[in-house]
């Protein structure tokens, strides 16, 4: 089929690569403009742009999806299907109605659960044991289109958002290829979503990065996993942010002063939560790279009884 592919971050790259390998024709790959990134704020291309150019595909980077010149260019491309994977922009009704076969989207949850911008983060932070990917026919409402296919993926109890992200990106790419095979054969289903079961995954807020030690250890553990690798959960030590990237649950029924360091050992340091304790194994101090907690303790010694956070 003749496609227009819309996507931006790493999550969309396996899907683009899989569709190229499947032999589809690309009228264009549309992605967001280059952005300044890193400490030097160097202007860098989105991962999808780099992948598309390496494959010899034509790339468009509109700054305004409602620009008349862009919309006319899109119309002249005459795509049979628009495929959207983590594009990061809302498509107007005019765009949704443009391709002959419609627009399809790959979403990183088992819809109608976790509609919205941060489905993987939210699933891990909420302690879900299962997630998945969904392909759907796009509708004007947020992630509310009819479902085509779904594939489930377990969330291991120690898994991070980064690990689940990478796995879903690969699983989703395969599901998308299968979805397009069904569409090409005019056999793709349209399964309406049950609105009564819909839940939402809004963008992360800065205050959600703060560890509140008075919460149960399991809740904090899920927060640490859910915010790894980005943006990272943090506590305060001597007024400075200390990001925590790795931890293990210990002493699930232990109680005591929340935020108190109860033990410092070879693997890291143990902190008392509202209920239960956490052995912190990986941290990132200000201006430094992520490091084992044992290495951190060599440069920043810690003693039992120290209080972390704002509790």
Swiss-Prot record:
Keywords: Protein biosynthesis, Transferase. (6S)-5,6,7,8-tetrahydrofolate binds at residues 109-112. Its EC number is 2.1.2.9. GO terms for molecular function: methionyl-tRNA formyltransferase activity. One of its GO terms (cellular component) is cytosol. InterPro entries: Fmt (IPR005794), Formyl_trans_C (IPR005793), Formyl_transf_N (IPR002376), Formyl_transf_N_sf (IPR036477), Formyl_transferase-like_C_sf (IPR011034), Met-tRNA-FMT_C (IPR044135), Met-tRNA-FMT_N (IPR041711). It catalyses: L-methionyl-tRNA(fMet) + (6R)-10-formyltetrahydrofolate = N-formyl-L-methionyl-tRNA(fMet) + (6S)-5,6,7,8-tetrahydrofolate + H(+). Belongs to the Fmt family. HAMAP family: Formyl_trans. Attaches a formyl group to the free amino group of methionyl-tRNA(fMet). The formyl group appears to play a dual role in the initiator identity of N-formylmethionyl-tRNA by promoting its recognition by IF2 and preventing the misappropriation of this tRNA by the elongation apparatus. This is Methionyl-tRNA formyltransferase.
